[in-house]
Amino acid sequence: MLTLCMDTAYKYLSLSLIEDGKIVAAIDEECFKKQSEMVFVKLDELFCMAKRDRLAIDSVCITSGPGSYTGVRIAMTIAKTIAEVAKLKLFTISTLRLYSNGEKNTMVIMDARASRAYVGIYDNGNTVMKDQVMNLNDINPENYNVVGDGSLIGKDDKMYTISGAFLKTMNFWEEVKEIDFLVPEYLKESDSYYR
């Protein structure tokens, strides 16, 4: 099965093709607020790198949020359209779970603005603490491998390769049964995105 994986939820554009437990081709770039401009160009590039036809994919996997208001919607809109038109399977994974890379005892932190962060804690991909929005002062990273925007809480910023993370977290992909009902997991009210 050839799966197109996409993440545009935060400041990265990650596109990869995974087949039989291997990455066939991948593009991982930081391009905050430019994903919508770059995604189709990079999709063409991805399929050229892989020497595969776009019609060869059997499924699509995307991050479902949290993330930037527009960012989460970019990959989701593309994936829903492809899956619906081509009758493909569609899978989702939490952005924070993906960014944990399936590693042990990992706290993922992503800037949510206004002195807050999206935080999720995972152990080998399993949820220890559900994804939530927290005030920066309330986050205690002690005893955790901190991934993401660690500098928000006095740690180093650290990020795994997102395309590789899709592969390492495959067991946690959730199949979408009703594409029409798939909506982003924002975790905060829409008006707070403008702060």
Question: What do the PLM-derived regions correspond to, one by one?
Answer:
Residues 43-59, 140-144:
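Phosphate/pyrophosphate-binding loops at sites that engage ATP/ADP/AMP, CoA/4′-phosphopantetheine
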Residues 32-48:
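N-terminal phosphate-binding loop and adjacent alpha-helix
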Residues 59-90, 95:
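DPxDG-like acidic metal-binding loop motif
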